[in-house]
């Protein structure tokens, strides 16, 4: 006869500290915890400081912190700001794009069948040159400016587990690889297709120490690549790949297009993201890695070291350190999922977008209309998760792109939030009432602009699924997780 014994285990991502000792968190730790919570539960962003404090103490019962300390920490990092003018942006530091229709036409004239690059109130943007019906294809960029391999998969690439260019996991048999000449004769690198091998024009000069190309030192490149991997310097690595392709194909317009895109120094972005402390939670260039213990001077040293290795990799490069910082900023401002698509890069942001994109398995990107677009209307994408509240959206936009969004949705949500925060009578609202009220307002404001689940899945971006607010208590408990999990263990 089989008996079942219930065992309760601790989740391996839980804080394993035990005992009654309390921890005094730093301001950075406080802010990072709140930001992570907001990303998990976007409705919590609109909670009043009293309610926010109550929930934080429940989440981190081993933390010793007062409500005022929490408030001051959030305020110092512009996360709980009563006045919009207290939020700094670096729009004035961004050099606008100088790319023209003629530059894009050199890549593919068909890209401009329905759109044109034009000056708008927000700088260069894409404007429809014809009416576009909802769901219609606007354009299709078949390739990015140059395909940039995924940095975090390079160890697998070196062992022949991933494609040397697109970084896709390979399932090809040895016979098929040899038959189609998809392997490298000098190392373990393989490619998943003939197209990827053809596009990987820099493999031999970057990866083989026997290369005699005077423009690139492969031994130093490998050191540079490993350093970028260790420190998660994705943008620096991307600039290196783009420059290497330019060196190998100097007659192409690759470098001209890349350096003509809008640009800002990476140093400016550090400052906007609070020296990569709490801002690291938002900073897309951090690749999800938080730098809670990295100060601005240390970041400067880190990037200076990266540039020194970059310069040694390309002995004849006349680029200086400031140029390098500007180019890494260029990549961060214009990239989508680690690739640079020069036409898509000109689409400005709105929290109520009228277009969406689909990434293709093999490098391409397609742009579709989310609603009817009239001739002369500007195309708009959302740069951030549209399910988040106005504070989180604006914070993420400020850190990554240097501006504060003033679209109708942001203005309406901000105005409502400020009325609640500034009214002393609202601080007496209970936790549940405040949570329900802010959730209802958020759902109402997003009703017309929320993307469908199909769109979110197609775009491949991170998104949040909300817990329904109208379920009974039994149902709610069935979907709520805590720090433990109970398993049924079979016993004989």
Curated annotation (Swiss-Prot):
The keyword Nucleus applies. It is an enzyme of class 2 (transferase). Keywords: Chromosome, Cytoplasm, Methyltransferase, Nucleus, S-adenosyl-L-methionine, Transferase. Pfam families: SET. Residues 425-448 are annotated as: Disordered. GO terms for biological process: methylation; negative regulation of gene expression, epigenetic. The keyword Nucleus applies. Histone methyltransferase that monomethylates 'Lys-5', 'Lys-8' and 'Lys-12' of histone H4 (H4K5me1, H4K8me1 and H4K12me1, respectively), thereby controlling gene expression and remodeling chromatin structures. Belongs to the class V-like SAM-binding methyltransferase superfamily. Histone-lysine methyltransferase family. SET5 subfamily. This is Histone-lysine N-methyltransferase SET5.
